[in-house]
């Protein structure tokens, strides 16, 4: 063997060894991080005790602001935050509903309430001024951005009515951002006055529709995906001020928006869903791969974690499944509407 051949063989051997070690390192790293993620998922969901809301000022005269508070998930947020000892500002469209809920909360939980009638479909500066006027003199520590709207039924983007498109973007995005702009400085001021002995909390409702690009719900899906990026960015900005920010991702919940009435293991009622949110506030649960995000209900968490760690949320496979499912839902909804119209005609 010539000297050149000998040197070449040694060089090739070293390169091969380096490649083998590199592959082994990546493999060990992947296995380790996956194992830690699984462990963190299980600990968040099933081991750690419920979060004590005293860290957010519960039973200390502090206030929570809840949007979309007259029905479903928003109403349940109001009740459960009050049960933990927070006074509550209720924001929704129908004043009569808000007043009834406020009376029930004050009677049952012995806390104070404020109500603000607010039509989220109208992007009106006077409405935001009304909110700011109410909360500016209150020691607010918690904001729940719950108000939202989806499509009446799954619909192709090119057939989406202009009003529905505008309402979805206005309610899910513009209103959420502008209410947060009004309330977050009040939360920061409250935390600062307490010398950070209490923390602030901003929860914004996300959706599997934003996690997974969803054909036939394209506008809604995009609006919720926007909230993912916005909420994570906001979390980075407000963390130094002692405010926790989280996007709350859910699959289906029984509500007027989902049009589902019967709960199941994978479709909780609002009470069980909100309990999971508040008990795990600040933890990632099923959203182990995402900063400042939580998927708190246990079956939703397992679904989210499974999708992220197998096919991926942006995969063609996931998109195709979503396409088929929502196309089928649309067909059934149109047939149901046709039968209803035929009955009226008869």
From Swiss-Prot:
The chain crosses the membrane at residues 19-39. It catalyses: a very-long-chain (3R)-3-hydroxyacyl-CoA + NADP(+) = a very-long-chain 3-oxoacyl-CoA + NADPH + H(+). It is found in: Endoplasmic reticulum membrane. It is a single-pass membrane protein. GO terms for cellular component: endoplasmic reticulum membrane. It is an enzyme of class 1 (oxidoreductase). The active site is at residues 220, 224. Pathway: Lipid metabolism; fatty acid biosynthesis. Pfam families: adh_short. Its EC number is 1.1.1.330. GO terms for biological process: fatty acid elongation; sphingolipid biosynthetic process; very long-chain fatty acid biosynthetic process. One of its GO terms (molecular function) is ketoreductase activity. NADP(+) binds at residues 65, 119, 146, 220, 224, 253, 255. SUPFAM superfamilies: NAD(P)-binding Rossmann-fold domains. Keywords: Endoplasmic reticulum, Fatty acid biosynthesis, Fatty acid metabolism, Lipid biosynthesis, Lipid metabolism, Membrane, NADP, Oxidoreductase, Transmembrane, Transmembrane helix. The keyword Membrane applies. Belongs to the short-chain dehydrogenases/reductases (SDR) family. HAMAP family: 3_ketoreductase. PANTHER family: HYDROXYSTEROID DEHYDROGENASE-LIKE PROTEIN 1 (PTHR43086:SF2), VERY-LONG-CHAIN 3-OXOOACYL-COA REDUCTASE (PTHR43086). Component of the microsomal membrane bound fatty acid elongation system, which produces the 26-carbon very long-chain fatty acids (VLCFA) from palmitate. Catalyzes the reduction of the 3-ketoacyl-CoA intermediate that is formed in each cycle of fatty acid elongation. VLCFAs serve as precursors for ceramide and sphingolipids. This is Very-long-chain 3-oxoacyl-CoA reductase.
